[in-house]
């Protein structure tokens, strides 16, 4: 396994020693069409306490169950249905992809990083598939794996997962992975993305679109007054994997829940009087919300939240009650003796989908403040000249936001709070559904 790049050389080395580096090819590499499945993707090598990678840091990125196709669609802007379909199986992948380009950039640039692309097997799911593996350094130089050199296994079924393995755990890195295509396949050259200008008029307009309804903001204002007075205030969140922090790197300090809490405390709190309770659990719907609220937020009566953010707009697709469990959770929080403020947050998937049309009427019925991330970001995704943030910049994968996406979500929540404080009489009512509804 060869490192990419040239090693350092100092006067202490032997004078006749040759500097090592990559071997120059006899002929230039053919200019091939390509697309990214990861582009400037933020990763974090979590410490592994057991197993094969014990003592090292690993970032797992799952690509099965349509995730690889979604990555090609969102990050690579691939629209060709034939190409997307081929990514669903190992046989299709082999017929499409000529080589894989990988680069990693991190602070410890000379430290080795191992890239692993694991195929899942038909008979032996995790042990029967091919492992495509190479070692590179964190200096940003691209290493390319040509698939003709890979020894494929007969049990291969579908592309399974990608792993970045770091010798030193708990460090962040930005990674790029792109697929170079075989002759006969073509995709348009990727567009260069602009840096997101958070001070721009366009960014502010995007944030403003998130305010779906102010509702009756009296409880919100009471929370702010309490915080300003230096009294203890608790902000709690209940939701799914986005509230847990999925897609944020590192998860606990870059997620929207932490960012909003920090912004609120910095602007309205005094002497660390604002507390955070984050009860996000991946894959859980509001049907479990009643139980989880008692256990994870109230902590069996030990906690009394002043503001509760409820985020289940992308978790309740399988809810057989069609929103009744969600409404029961909302009314349970509203009817608590301490009368906490309730804020409904509607996140969004990369295909522009959420359950806003089903759940927003609950907020309207009880005159609750509501924030729609879908309304904020999806209209500008389709723009070219005036686009503020691309899907690749906003989404970590098909379901979860990047650090930037989490930042935008936090900014949307803060915008509602600021409007409630500055304009107490405002009441923006929920009106018409957006083009993508819950049945799409």
What kind of feature is each model-predicted range?
Residues 143-180, 184:
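Extracellular beta-strand ligand-recognition surfaces/modules
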Residues 430-437:
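Conserved small/polar residues in nucleotide/adenosyl-binding loops
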Residues 440:
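Hard-cation-handling environments
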């Amino acid at each position: 396994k060869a490192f990419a790049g040239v090693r350092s050389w100092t006067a202490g080395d032997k004078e006749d020693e040759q500097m090592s580096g990559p071997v120059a090819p006899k002929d230039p590499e053919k200019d091939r069409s390509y697309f990214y499945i990861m582009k400037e993707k933020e990763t974090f090598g979590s410490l592994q306490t057991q197993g094969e990678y014990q003592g090292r840091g690993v970032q797992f990125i799952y690509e099965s169950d349509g995730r690889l196709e979604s990555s090609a669609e969102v990050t690579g802007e691939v629209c060709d249905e034939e190409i997307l379909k081929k990514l669903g199986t190992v046989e299709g992948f082999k017929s499409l992809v000529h080589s894989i380009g990988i680069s990693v950039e991190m602070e410890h640039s000379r430290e080795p990083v191992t890239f692993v692309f694991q195929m899942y097997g038909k008979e032996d799911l995790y042990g029967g598939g091919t492992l495509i593996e190479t070692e590179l350094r964190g200096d940003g130089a691209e290493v390319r794996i040509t698939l003709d050199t890979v020894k494929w296994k007969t049990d291969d079924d579908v592309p399974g997962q990608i792993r970045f393995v770091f010798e030193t755990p708990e460090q962040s890195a930005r990674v790029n992975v792109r697929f170079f295509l075989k002759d006969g396949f073509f995709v348009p050259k990727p567009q260069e993305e602009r840096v997101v200008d958070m001070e721009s008029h366009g960014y502010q307009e995007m944030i403003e679109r998130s305010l779906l309804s102010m509702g009756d903001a009296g409880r919100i204002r009471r929370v702010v007054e309490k915080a300003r007075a230096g009294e203890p205030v608790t902000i709690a969140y209940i939701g799914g994997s986005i509230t847990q922090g999925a897609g944020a790197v590192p998860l606990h300090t870059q997620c929207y829940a932490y960012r909003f809490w920090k912004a609120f405390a910095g602007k309205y709190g005094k002497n660390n009087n604002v507390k955070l309770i984050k009860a996000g659990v991946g894959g859980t719907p509001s049907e479990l919300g009643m139980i989880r609220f008692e256990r994870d937020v109230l902590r069996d009566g030990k906690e009394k939240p002043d503001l509760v953010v409820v985020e289940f707009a992308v978790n309740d697709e399988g809810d057989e009650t069609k929103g009744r469990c969600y409404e029961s959770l909302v009314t349970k929080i509203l009817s608590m003796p301490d009368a906490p403020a309730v804020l409904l947050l509607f996140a969004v998937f990369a295909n522009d989908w959420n359950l806003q049309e089903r759940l927003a009427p609950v907020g309207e019925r009880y005159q609750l403040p509501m924030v729609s991330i879908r309304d904020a970001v999806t209209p500008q995704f389709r723009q070219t000249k005036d686009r503020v943030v691309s899907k690749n910049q906003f989404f970590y994968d098909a379901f979860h936001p990047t650090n930037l996406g989490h930042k935008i979500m936090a900014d949307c929540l803060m915008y509602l709070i600021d409007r409630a404080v500055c304009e107490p009489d405002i009441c923006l009512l929920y009106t018409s559904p957006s083009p993508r509804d819950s049945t799409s």
